[in-house]
Amino acid sequence: MNLDSLSKIIKNKIQNVLYPTSKALLSSDDPSKRAETCYDLSQKIEEFELVCDELYGIIEIHKQNVIFSNINNGTHISKENNPEVLFNSLVSRLSTLRQTKSTMDSFAKEISIVQPIDNKANTNNNNNNNNNNNNNNNNNNNNNNNTNTNTNNTNNTNNTTNTNNTNNNNNNNYNNNNNNNNNNNNNNNNNNNNNNNNSINNSINNNSNNKVGSNDNPSTAPITENNTENNAGNTNNTNNNNNNNNNNNNNNNNNNNNNNNNTNQVAESSNISSNTTPPETTNIVNDPNSVSGGNLTNTEAPMEISDNSEIQHPQQEQQQQQQQQQQQQQQQQQQQQQPQEQIPQQQQPQLPMQQEQIQQLPQQQTPPSQQQPQQTPPLPQQFQQPLVNVNQITSPTLENQSISGNNNNNNDGQTISPQQQQEQLQLQMQQLQQLQMQQQQMNFNPTEPINTNFYNIDLQQPIQQQTLNNNNNNINSLENQINTNLGGNTFNTGTTPPLQQQPQPQQQQQINNPEINQIDDDNTMKETIDVDKIIEESNNVNNNVNNRQVIDLE
């Protein structure tokens, strides 16, 4: 490369790069654009300096060669071709460019515009931001863990409450054992049964959380998709359970101990009077100053078992006792004069229980022409054992025993004959069957169309739930009285086997009216035929509902 070519390169750099950049710098009014132009010009000057440095080295070599050649040849070198002149002019331009570069750098600093950031700096900043985000996520996770810990603490508190309830139940058992030493085994069995019932109730409530329905009547309605509604359902179920427990406590006066009805009732079931009045319930009050081991008994009026099973006010106890005594004496006289007949019950809706828990009682088969629309619905599982045949009871515990009460009854020390005890058992059996049928009437029939208003139960007015609870309490009290009369065995509770009892065949009333059974030639008695057809069609409909299958439309 000769000097001429280098001179052209330098001129092109100056004219095409440096000057336009300088003009753009001077003509721009925007400070940010001026800063960018200054930065661009500074970089171009650096590139020009590299070219000048290369040219400087070439000139040095060329200068020496020219000098030596001139010395050797003795020729004259013109001004334009003199390397020294060219070199000096180049050095002056380089100094000017360096001053311009320094001026551009200082100008960029004066306008206070930050130069563009390198890619390396950007990468580092992004990494720092990512690290900060990770730290934030970790903090959020820690907060979630704290929330879970608080929830666990709440559960522990609930467990502590349950433990306290258990201790209260144990205290009640101790008091009952002091009052009735003969019923220790019954108390233990009943407490175990209460625990089993609690687990069953909890499972039913858990199932009802995912379904639309009340606690006692879970149905197959669509599952709600809103978690908030499910939570509300759980709250409602809890409130209902609390109401149930409160009702049980008010009815049976069990010292506010939930699910302890059987214990107190079995302890009090030995108080049977000659006039067949219900036993008075006792409230066990812990009194350390008492002589009998800290156990005082407060007597209250019994709760009358009425048709609608409503809670009776204590002020009506005298009238109720008188009416109940008169009714029971009349029933005893009627039973002594005539044999007991099965009262035909109307067809009632079945309980919404599982199919494996529903068992039919034995029934007599009658011809289709003699079938009646009255049918006895199945009983719940806890009452599905056959009833006791009173005539077959030969327990030595029922013969001439002097049953004295612990609750200050008026008939303490009276002797009850076996015949009177059998009559009392018959009356109690009748009351138990009536309460069972009444409870089934309150329940929901799953074969009927679903009434959505049925599930809109107001928690502030649990009238139907309270009635069902009263029925349950009355049934439990009757069961305990019957069990005590039978010798202290529990009544189908699941822990002790029930007595081997002979089933009583259900009697059905047959219409022996020849005018109705006989059909004239003119078909004047079509009503009897229509009734039979209706019965058959209803049975077919029920069978179709119970045995419904998926039909392939194709």
Swiss-Prot record:
Nucleus listed as a keyword: yes
Location in the cell: Nucleus
GO biological process: transcription by RNA polymerase II
Sections of the chain in a coiled coil: 167-194, 419-486
Gene Ontology cellular-component annotations: mediator complex
Subunit structure: Component of the Mediator complex.
Similarity remark: Belongs to the Mediator complex subunit 29 family.
Protein known as: Putative mediator of RNA polymerase II transcription subunit 29
Organism, scientific name: Dictyostelium discoideum
